Amino acid sequence: MNQEQIKRIVEESEADVIIHTAAISDVGTCEKTPEASYHANVLLPVYLANASDGRKLICFSSDQVYRGCESDGPYREDEAKPANIYGAHKLEMEQRVLDRQPDSVMLRAEWMYDDISPRGNYLLNVLNAEETLTFGKQYRGITYLREVCENMERVIKLPGGVYNFGSETTQSMYEITKEFLRITGSRQQVQEGSAVHNLWMDCGKAAEHGVVFSGVMDGLKRCLGDYGLI
């Protein structure tokens, strides 16, 4: 899509708020097709920003902007350092959209999950695994999609800027998965793999404005309960 097409869609919508979630989010795909990634992950949000005068624009970014950070985290908004094309494009998107629309909100989202999804996510991957699972000593947040939706009214009221957005954790992905299998009564096995770069975030900035999430383990338990899985 080009700028004129985006402008027409926005004008015809008569929307007061635009929430942009679309992306090419597969890191490997972005590495293989950087031009497509740039169009989807940078140019389209910029086109939206150009067409959003007088409207509140909310764009989903990614925790991948922290992939190259040298410290162990958890990471604050001012510590971004991408290490792949997807993360670099998301960071450029944030900067360019905010330059055009300073009141817009950039949400650095985590890996999201739900029991109903057309594509794999943490919850479904673990529930449907047929072989031994392997997770490294990596600290990262994963977020229940329902809590994302529940927070959107508060997100709309956020001052313009960049916000870490999702569940916080004090457990590694291996520890989380081990606990997840225990509470579901699964006989599936999980083994600890090699250490992987952390992606956990400090979400205190958003929390100061009332945008709060369950911790990672509590979010998983809530999701399992909501769908009658425990």
Pin down the residues of each PLM region.
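Glycine-rich NAD(P)-binding loop of the Rossmann-fold in SDR/ketoreductase-type enzymes
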Residues: 1, 32-44, 77-80, 88-91
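SDR active-site strand-loop-helix element
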Residues: 18-22, 57-63, 107-109
